[in-house]
Amino acid sequence: MSEARQQSSSEGGGDLSDYEEKFEQCCTLLEQRIIQDDQIPRNVRRAAKQAIEALKEEGQSPGVRASTAISTLEEVVNDQNTPEYARTVLLQVIATLEQVKDEV
């Protein structure tokens, strides 16, 4: 039984790569669908850049990184100037980050 506990605790590092994979997916979505789209208002693109920076901040725990990015994106998701298709992408990213935050 103790061997199983040791294995599960040593697999904790594998969980970290799961977080990193989700963070990378979110960063890719934000980069390709928000930041590179000139039709999206500057404040929304700026928030997406800030969220990416928060997700890449390796000095913080995955939960803190996800929470910081979520709060940044939530500031602009309800902005009346945010196009509907951009809002959909932002909500998709927020949902993915909520999973990470809840797992921690």
Curated annotation (Swiss-Prot):
Matching Pfam families, A to Z? UPF0147
Matches recorded under InterPro entries: Ta0600-like_sf, UPF0147
Classification via NCBIfam families: PRK04330.1
Family, according to the entry, reads as follows: Belongs to the UPF0147 family.
- What is the name of the protein in this document? UPF0147 protein MK1586
Write down the species: Methanopyrus kandleri (strain AV19 / DSM 6324 / JCM 9639 / NBRC 100938)
